[in-house]
């Protein structure tokens, strides 16, 4: 694992699938000798896991005994509060930034999440720290939220357009990953 910078700008969803979950599953099998495993995906990692399981199903590979998803979107038809930021105009603006920089800075993502809970994660700190001069109280969620992960340009653009804007992940065979069209409804992993 590493935090991507400009040199990884052309890494896409396919690359993340092949170099992430698929490589990890191969490493588990090679290290332990076990051919089936239990897996977990969190947030965008869960979306990647769902994509991977659909791809594995298409390839008739079955290394996963069970899958657990935590705060994961697979159907993006109602993404919650972040949906106000998802439209073609906004995405084109983000893509212009991605073209220049090569990646989305994790701090930009953290700021977006802060705005989703602006009273708790933004304005209270602005008021108390800046206006009132109070020392901020320790808050573990804020530390976690500032430990952002950069996202490569190609992967992030794909994620925004294909998942959020067009909701193609839940459309059978609407996405092709590593040469295979995928269908989430074909996944039979508990």
In which residue ranges do the predicted regions lie?
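Short coil/turn segments at beta-strand junctions that form active-site/ligand-binding loops
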Residues: 34-37, 189
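Gly/Ala-rich beta-loop-alpha elbow adjacent to hydrolase catalytic centers
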Residues: 40-45, 49
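Alpha/beta-hydrolase-fold enzymes
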Residues: 30, 34, 48-156, 167
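C-terminal subdomain of alpha/beta-hydrolase-fold enzymes, centered on the catalytic histidine
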Residues: 138-190
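Short, glycine-/Ser/Thr-/acidic-enriched flexible segments
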Residues: 2-4, 23, 45, 54, ...
């Amino acid at each position: 694992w590493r935090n991507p910078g400009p040199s990884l700008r052309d890494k896409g969803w396919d690359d993340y699938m092949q170099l992430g979950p698929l490589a990890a599953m191969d490493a588990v099998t090679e290290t332990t000798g076990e051919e089936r495993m239990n897996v977990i995906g969190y947030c965008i990692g869960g979306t990647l896991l769902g994509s991977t399981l659909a791809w594995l199903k298409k390839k008739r590979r079955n290394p996963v005994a069970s899958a657990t998803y935590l705060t994961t979107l697979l159907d993006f038809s109602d993404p919650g509060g972040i949906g106000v930021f998802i439209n073609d105009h906004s995405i084109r603006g983000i893509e212009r930034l991605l073209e220049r920089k090569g990646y989305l800075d994790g701090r930009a993502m953290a700021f977006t999440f802060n705005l989703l809970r602006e009273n708790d994660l933004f304005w209270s700190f602005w008021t108390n720290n800046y206006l009132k001069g109070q020392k901020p109280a320790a808050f573990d969620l804020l530390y976690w939220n500032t430990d952002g992960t950069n996202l490569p340009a190609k992967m992030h653009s794909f994620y925004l357009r294909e998942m959020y804007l067009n909701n193609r992940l839940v459309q059978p065979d609407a996405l092709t990953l590593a040469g295979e069209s995928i269908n989430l409804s074909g996944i039979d992993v508990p």
